[in-house]
Amino acid sequence: MVGVSKTFTNQKKVLNNIYLSFFYGAKIGIIGLNGSGKSTLMKIIAGLEKNFQGEVVFSPGYTVGYLEQEPQLDDTKTVREVVEEGCAEVVALLKEYEEVNAKFMEPMDDDQMAKLIERQGELTEAIDHKNGWELDATLERAMDALRCPDPDEPVKHLSGGERRRVALCRLLLQEPDVLLLDEPTNDIDVNTLRALEEGLNNFAGCAVVISHDRWFLDRIATHILAFEGDSQVVFFEGSYSEYEENKRKRLGDDTPHRVKYRKLLA
């Protein structure tokens, strides 16, 4: 993010000339009062908010996954069908593999047979590379870890907390480079919270998490991005508790605190 600012139509400025980058392995907790600009910043990173000043530059080939506070799910699908969307590429490969195998039962000449065998080999290699043969086990482990409802349960029957868990499960299976979570601990129980912590701690990319749960942030955050009022944003390297200690030491210090700039996904 290069010089990013955002002013709403009522002239309220929530972001003011922010320079910010992320890097693999970082777990960044975003804190601040409601209305301070946290969700706006996240939507800009996700590419959902286009009306802002400045520039957002991404490394080639990056992927971003975003969990909103109220996830949008297809109510016509089952829990498993929604979770499968997180492995869409593998699902498509397996479907084509079955279709190719079925074609071997059809009459064909030698040239057609050779092409079919070649395609079958390509699909087998691609599925092997993605460990796609274990799709059912992968989905089951992911759903169990986040205590998702029964796989056959229609999404339209889920509670708000259940929808959030299903959406989070789908998102983690996508394995994006940058993972954006807006209040992921809302409406989840202690066991699901533990699973979320484990998933984030094992996540290889950069995770950016908005949360009012200070205890949760202290367990997962390697950095804190704090909206401290008057459009002032502080980027701190360390846990939430360490940030709080640093903030207490800064009380009475009039030196301006600027967001540190780091190279993103080089």
Please provide the spans of the model-predicted regions:
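ABC ATP-binding cassette signature C-motif
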Residues: 1-266
